[in-house]
């Protein structure tokens, strides 16, 4: 097969483009092996969703149906592996620091486990309209309990019961947030939730009775929110500020100001040590009592996300350099694992509640699950679409992935088998 050259007049889609744009270009490359004359188009000339839905009356369902119900292998759309190769070769990456290349990254060798070895595919719900309003802020999906998925949809927060495929609106902010598609980040506890916007507002809400309160913090985006009690949360902002908010106070407390935009800030329980990830090449451990930097954790490009292991000794950071690094807080001289992504920037990291696995979420198409015993075995979850967020259930038995795409989006659910191989040390 050739390298999939483009006909000259067709351009690569930009970062964060919807799948419809990629598919429209894909059909004019040598990767495509289907029949363009069979593709159904809308009045703008773009392929419609009907091309990627199984037609039970058709005699052309000779291929395999993937997680998203796409009937790959039929005469119209061709083989799945060809579109996967196209995405891998053409997906647009952005960077803030240009003095590095993927070839220079020193990555650990990881054994890819058999499909469904850690978590098995359970269901794909197409009705939820999950939104991620910035391609690096993959923080729009949370889970309460075992089956209630909280997600961002337009200017509202909705809750999906995945057992019954039933979605209800928790709060509608269209009259409280002036701009459309403004919600940038989300976090929840068992009783309340909190969200931030791209325009400096934040909102705390009760998803059981629908009550909420909004406040204005600044004119810059709030990039991350973490609730560490039902009345306190920490915020990371695009102007470099880190705030702690107590809802009983009249204004938040500025605890640190970075020289770059803060993409993620994570406190471990209620300790004073915060993991702060910024647009610089370093994540930082900051003591919020003394406003001092305890350690720097280097990457090759902007650091977008971080997460603490439940034991408090291990943490992970990920960023635009397409790596996830794992650190031991007792020996921070260098990361002890350097894990590579499959296609794009690492935008979300989360350990399972008991710490057996680490979910490494990319900007699009891939979530990798690493066994935290040695971080040398992974399960690769492969689908298509920009990722709105990834979250474990409270027990860690289920993993939910929000896919933001108007044609192929929804919520993917994976469930741990009764006999599972995951284990961990530390």
From Swiss-Prot:
Compartments it resides in: Cytoplasm
PROSITE patterns for the chain: WD_REPEATS_1, WD_REPEATS_2, WD_REPEATS_REGION
GO cellular component: cytosol
Keywords: Cytoplasm, Repeat, WD repeat
InterPro entries: WD40/YVTN_repeat-like_dom_sf, WD40_repeat_CS, WD40_repeat_dom_sf, WD40_rpt
Signal peptide: none
Keyword check for S-adenosyl-L-methionine: no
Each WD repeat, start to end: 217-255, 298-337, 341-380
A Pfam entry, by short name: WD40
Protein name: Uncharacterized WD repeat-containing protein C2A9.03
Alphabetical list of Gene3D superfamilies matching this protein: YVTN repeat-like/Quinoprotein amine dehydrogenase
């Amino acid at each position: 097969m050739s390298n999939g050259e483009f006909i000259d007049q067709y351009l690569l889609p930009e970062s964060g483009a919807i799948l419809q744009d990629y598919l429209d270009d894909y059909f004019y490359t040598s990767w495509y092996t289907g029949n363009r004359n069979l593709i159904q188009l809308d009045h703008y000339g773009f392929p419609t969703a009907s091309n990627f839905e199984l037609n039970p009356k058709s005699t052309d369902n000779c291929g395999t149906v993937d997680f998203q119900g796409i009937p790959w292998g039929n005469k119209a759309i061709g083989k799945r592996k060809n579109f996967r190769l196209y995405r891998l070769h053409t997906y647009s990456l952005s960077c803030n620091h240009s003095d590095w290349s993927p070839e220079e990254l020193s990555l650990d060798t990881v054994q890819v486990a058999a499909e469904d070895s850690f978590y098995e595919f359970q269901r794909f719900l197409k009705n939820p309209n999950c939104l991620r309003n910035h391609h690096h802020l993959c923080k729009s999906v949370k889970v309460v309990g075992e089956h209630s998925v909280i997600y961002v949809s337009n200017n509202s927060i909705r809750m999906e019961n995945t057992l019954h495929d039933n979605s209800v609106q928790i709060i509608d902010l269209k009259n409280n947030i002036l701009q459309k598609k403004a919600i940038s980040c989300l976090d929840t506890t068992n009783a309340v939730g909190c969200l931030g916007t791209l325009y400096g507002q934040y909102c705390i809400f009760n998803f059981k009775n629908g009550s909420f309160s909004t406040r204005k913090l600044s004119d810059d985006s709030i990039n991350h929110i973490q609730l560490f009690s039902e009345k306190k949360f920490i915020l990371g902002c695009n102007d470099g500020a880190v705030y702690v908010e107590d809802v009983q106070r009249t204004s938040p407390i500025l605890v640190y100001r970075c020289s770059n935009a803060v993409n993620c800030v994570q406190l471990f329980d209620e300790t004073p040590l915060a993991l702060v990830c910024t647009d610089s090449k370093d994540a930082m451990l900051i003591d919020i009592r003394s406003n001092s930097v305890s350690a720097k954790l280097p990457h090759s490009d902007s650091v977008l996300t971080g997460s603490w292991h439940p034991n408090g000794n291990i943490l992970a950071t990920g960023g635009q350099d397409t790596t996830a690094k794992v650190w031991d807080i007792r020996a921070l001289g260098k990361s002890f694992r350097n894990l590579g992504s499959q296609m794009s920037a690492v935008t979300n990291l989360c350990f399972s509640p008991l710490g057996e696995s680490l979910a490494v979420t990319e900007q699009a198409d891939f979530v990798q699950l690493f066994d935290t015993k040695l971080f040398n075995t992974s399960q690769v979850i492969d689908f298509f679409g920009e990722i709105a967020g990834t979250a474990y259930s409270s027990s860690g038995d289920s993993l939910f992935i929000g896919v933001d795409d108007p044609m192929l989006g929804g919520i993917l659910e994976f469930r741990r088998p009764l006999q599972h191989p995951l284990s961990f040390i530390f």
